[in-house]
């Protein structure tokens, strides 16, 4: 009998398989405490989120150790900047050199923005590190309703999208239920914005024409002076 070739598994799949084995082992040993139940639930959610994001062709970029600090050189290189906001106790967001945002948490998923820029996004779990600051950072509700880790460009700000309140670069979370606080830009408002841009362009053109006219007068005056000098020399 020929042995079937085993399918290739990603790092996320391997982690899920290991967690499932640990869960089964815990059930066989009869560990049914509160803490164990919560851990198993969180692991199940974590694996399902990974599969969901992999289905959207997003790139899993690793798993973070809970004991690692926010300034870990593995997470943030020398060119990156750390922006703090709110209370000093809140974990800072790490702004990557390539223009992305990495939020603290256990799992990161990389999604491509509508403007072609890659951003890293963390789904907040129910661990110790985000038990206190979940409401102040990207809230648990926002993280849960983020459907398939989809991202939109801040320029495509339309109804049904909610801006992540803790994001320093304005990442938009794709919400299926629609956000009450996000008004849809009307046709009239868009027309007014376009008219304003046209008016600004007209003003710039007018100023440039005035400068050009002054330069032409100056050139004519210089030419007259040259003619006078030539006449006097002759």
UniProtKB/Swiss-Prot annotation:
Where, subcellularly, is it found? Virion; Host cytoplasm; Host nucleus
Q: Name one GO cellular component term.
A: host cell nucleus
Report which residue ranges the record marks as coiled coil: 183-234
Q: How does it assemble?
A: Interacts with host HSC70.
Please explain the role this protein plays, according to its UniProt record: May play a role in virus replication, from virus entry and uncoating to assembly and budding of the virus particle. Interaction of viral NEP with M1-Hsc70 is thought to promote nuclear export of the viral encapsidated genomes.
| Alphabetical keyword list | Coiled coil, Host cytoplasm, Host nucleus, Virion
Where composition is biased (Basic and acidic residues), the residues are 76-96
Which intervals of the chain are annotated as region Disordered? Answer: 1-103
Superkingdom assignment: Viruses
Where is it predominantly found?
virion
Protein name from the UniProt record: Matrix protein 1
């Amino acid at each position: 009998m020929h042995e079937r070739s085993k399918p290739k598994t990603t790092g996320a799949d391997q982690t899920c398989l290991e967690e499932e084995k640990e869960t089964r082992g815990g059930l066989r040993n009869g560990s049914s405490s509160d803490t164990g139940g919560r851990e198993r639930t969180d692991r199940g959610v974590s694996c399902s989120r990974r599969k969901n994001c992999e289905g959207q062709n997003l790139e899993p970029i690793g798993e973070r150790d809970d004991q690692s600090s926010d300034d870990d050189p593995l997470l943030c290189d020398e060119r990156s900047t750390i922006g703090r906001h709110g209370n000093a106790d809140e974990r800072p967001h790490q702004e990557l050199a390539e223009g992305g945002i990495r939020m603290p948490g256990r799992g990161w998923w990389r999604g491509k923005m509508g403007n072609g820029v890659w951003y890293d996004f963390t789904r907040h779990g129910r661990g110790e590190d985000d038990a206190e600051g979940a409401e102040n950072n990207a809230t648990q509700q926002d993280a849960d309703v983020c459907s398939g880790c989809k991202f939109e460009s801040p320029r495509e700000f339309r109804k049904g999208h909610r801006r992540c309140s803790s994001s320093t670069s304005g990442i938009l979370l794709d919400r299926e239920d629609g956000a009450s606080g996000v008004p849809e830009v009307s046709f009239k408002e868009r027309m007014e914005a376009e008219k304003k841009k046209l008016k600004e362009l007209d003003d710039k053109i007018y100023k440039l024409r005035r400068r050009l006219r002054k330069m032409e007068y100056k050139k004519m005056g210089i030419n007259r002076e040259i003619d006078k000098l030539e006449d006097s020399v002759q």
